[in-house]
């Protein structure tokens, strides 16, 4: 699930949700909702922006 992978990659890079939000241009509330499982299937463009900010392939967050 993206929620566990997103948090794992974010923490591995030592980023807070706010820092990732700034790097990815995705709202912090959206990131929090994804990580909490409230948005388990984010839009592909959102996943792409998060992956780019985390320097991973989008498939790694799928």
Spell out what each predicted region is:
Residues 39-40:
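Gly/Pro-rich interdomain helix-loop hinge
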Residues 7, 18, 48:
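Residues within the helices of the helix-turn-helix
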Residues 1-12, 59:
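A short, Lys/Arg-rich alpha-helix, primarily the initiator
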Residues 36:
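Short, conserved catalytic or interaction motifs in soluble domains
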Residues 14-33:
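Short alpha-helical DNA-recognition segment
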Residues 10, 21, 51:
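The alpha-helix within a helix-turn-helix
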Residues 25, 43-60:
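DNA major-groove recognition helix of helix-turn-helix/homeodomain DNA-binding modules
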């Amino acid at each position: 699930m993206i929620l566990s992978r997103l948090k794992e990659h974010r923490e591995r890079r030592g980023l807070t949700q706010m820092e990732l939000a700034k790097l990815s241009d995705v709202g912090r509330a959206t990131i929090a909702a994804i990580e909490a499982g409230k948005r388990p299937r984010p839009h592909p463009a959102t996943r792409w922006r998060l992956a780019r900010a985390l320097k991973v392939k989008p498939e790694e967050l799928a």
